[in-house]
């Protein structure tokens, strides 16, 4: 590989320098996106998260750039299931002792009932006589003559309209 042109001297004060490789969304020198006169006008290698608009899009916020294998160890308390803090039980007032009960009297078995006296036998029931045909109903009072019913309208499935 022959170099056709010598590499340009890269100094700490050169704001136009890109890192090796194709410039991507986050490969700009520090302060490129900062407005003029912004206090973050620092020259040097680009740092993700330094006022970099692309840092949020690329998934690298720049907060944890220590190393890929760095994991934040959890304290041992975080592994245990959380316990709800219980309020200490308030001791109840001591119960007032009751006076002792009188001892129960033992149950005395009841005297056996006297045997039932048989009832006097009745005559067997006479079979019912067939009903006599009733006389036709008497008409209602004369002041209220019966009027024939008017037929109702047939109901529809939708209900009354």
Swiss-Prot record:
Spans annotated as 12 X 6 AA approximate tandem repeats: 85-156
PTMs per UniProt: May be phosphorylated on Ser residues by host kinases.
Superkingdom to which the source organism belongs: Viruses
Keywords: DNA-binding, Host cytoplasm, Host nucleus, Host-virus interaction, Inhibition of host autophagy by virus, Inhibition of host innate immune response by virus, Inhibition of host interferon signaling pathway by virus, Inhibition of host MDA5 by virus, Inhibition of host PKR by virus, Inhibition of host RIG-I by virus, Inhibition of host RLR pathway by virus, Inhibition of host TBK1 by virus, Inhibition of host TLR pathway by virus, Interferon antiviral system evasion, Late protein, Phosphoprotein, Repeat, RNA-binding, Viral immunoevasion
A GO biological process held by the record: symbiont-mediated suppression of host toll-like receptor signaling pathway
Biased composition range(s): Basic residues: 30-39
Sequence repeats: 85-90, 91-96, 97-102, 103-108, 109-114, 115-120, 121-126, 127-132, 133-138, 139-144, 145-150, 151-156
Residue spans of biased composition, Pro residues class: 1-12
One annotated Gene Ontology cellular component of this protein: host cell nucleus
Main location: host cell
Protein family membership: Belongs to the simplex virus US11 protein family.
Summary of subunit composition and partner proteins: Associates with RNA derived from the 60S ribosomal subunits. Seems to form large heterogeneous polymers of up to 200 identical subunits in the cytoplasm. Interacts with host EIF2AK2. Interacts with host NCL. Interacts with host RIGI; this interaction prevents RIGI binding to host MAVS. Interacts with host IFIH1; this interaction prevents host IFH1 binding to MAVS. Interacts with host HSP90; this interaction inhibits TBK1-induced interferon induction.
Protein name: Accessory factor US11
């Amino acid at each position: 590989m022959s170099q056709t042109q010598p590499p340009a001297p890269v100094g700490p004060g050169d704001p136009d320098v890109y890192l090796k490789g194709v410039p991507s969304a986050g490969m700009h020198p520090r302060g490129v996106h900062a407005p003029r006169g912004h206090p973050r006008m620092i020259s040097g290698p680009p740092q993700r998260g330094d006022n970099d608009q692309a840092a949020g899009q690329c998934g690298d916020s720049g907060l944890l750039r220590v190393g890929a294998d760095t994991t934040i160890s959890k304290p041992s308390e975080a592994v245990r299931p959380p316990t709800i803090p219980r309020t200490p039980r308030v001791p109840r007032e001591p119960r007032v002792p009751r006076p002792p009960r009188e001892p129960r009297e033992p149950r005395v078995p009841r005297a056996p009932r006297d045997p039932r006296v048989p009832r006097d036998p009745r005559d067997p029931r006479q079979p019912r006589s067939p009903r006599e045909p009733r006389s036709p109903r008497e008409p209602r009072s004369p002041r209220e003559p019966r009027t024939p019913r008017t037929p109702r309208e047939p109901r529809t499935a939708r209900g009354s309209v």
